[in-house]
Amino acid sequence: LRKACDQVLKIKGFDTSLGIPHFAGISLNQIPGDPDSVKGSKVRGVYWTRPDSTGKEVIRDSKINESLYSEFVQEFKDTYFHYVYKELSKIFKLGRVRLLLKEPRSTLSWHRDPEPRLHIPIYTNPGAIMVVDSIAKHLPADGSVWITNNTKYHNAFNGGEEDRIHLVACVLDYKFN
């Protein structure tokens, strides 16, 4: 996984123009024939947050039809991620599949997403923590696949001094009990 990540980063660096400090992404799949589907806010995606003391929930960004993301990006087809994508697609109905970077000593907002997420940690450190519904967990980079209920309020923060990079996929058919 690390070798594949390094290959992708040599082909295309992280898109840091997503409007969220210390966060970046690279899309591994796209809407067939639509290279614009992997740019800008489409890498980030829609989410809901409660940004201030009123506690009022607001939506950020435009909704994305995740089910349209079914074509692996051509320039990454020679990486191990193409194999991983094909294997995961046999088990799950996937939406966008991305490499997501959380830079050292940084955090996201407390937010929720429209669907669960599949995480495969690639680069991490003990200070990189995922918090879902007030439960904190470090996801080690040991090859495991984690399904997180991102429809609940959650956060990812990197309290370490090294980058945190996960392969993250939107899972469209997964139901939590």
Which stretches of residues belong to each language-model region?
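Non-heme Fe(II)/2-oxoglutarate
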Residues: 1-84
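A short hydrophobic beta-strand segment most commonly corresponding to one strand
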Residues: 118-121, 145-147, 161-177
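Residues that flank catalytic or metal-binding motifs in active/ligand-binding sites
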Residues: 95, 114-116, 163
